[in-house]
Amino acid sequence: RRQRQMCIRDRSKALAEAKTAFEKDEVPVGAVIVSNDKIIARAHNLTEMLNDVTAHAEMQAITSAANYLGGKYLNDCTLYVTLEPCQMCAGAMYWAQLSRLVFGATDPHRGYRKLNTTLHPKTKVSYGVLSNECKLLIDAFFIKKRKLKKT
C-alpha cells in the first residue's frame, strides 16, 4: 500500500512539472526521478527558454539525478515522465542504465517505440499511468499553439 501511494505521489509530481512547462509555453512534459522512495530530480521541458533542442524534461532530470548521486548511472532509479520519451531521451536512458521507466501518454509520432529504439535490457517499462491527464495537457497545448498561429 505504501509503495502504491509513493507511485501516485511521483506520477502526480511529474504531471505538476508538465503543468509548469505549459505555463511557460513549453511543450508540457514533466519528469521525476526516484531513488529509494525519494525524489532526487524534477524537471520539465526547457527547449524554448534555453533555445536548446536537447533540453527535454527527461534529459534535464537525468542530468540532475546524476549530479545528485555523484555518478552517471541510474541503475537503481525510476523515471516517471508524462509523455513517452523520444529516441534521444531513450538513448540517454540506455546509457544511464535506468532501472525503470513509467510514462503517461504514448507518443505515436515521436515516441521511442515508433522507431523500435531499445532501452537498456535491465530497464522495466510501464505506461498508461495518468495517461488521460497527460494527453489532455499535451492536446490543450497544441490547440492553443494552433489558435495563436491563426491570429
What is each stretch, according to the model?
Residues 9-24:
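Short, basic/aromatic recognition patches
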Residues 25-26, 97:
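Glycine-centered short loops/turns at secondary-structure junctions
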Residues 1-8:
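Short, small-residue-biased leader/transition segments that mark boundaries at the very start
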Residues 29-37:
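Short beta-strand scaffold segments in enzyme catalytic cores
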Residues 25, 72-75, 148-149:
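Short, structured loop/turn "capping" segments at alpha-beta junctions
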Residues 3, 27-29:
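Short loop/turn microsegments at loop-to-beta-strand junctions
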Residues 12, 35, 41-143:
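Zn2+-dependent cytidine deaminase-like catalytic core
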Residues 143-151:
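Glycine-rich adenosyl-binding loop in Rossmann-like folds that engage adenosine-containing cofactors
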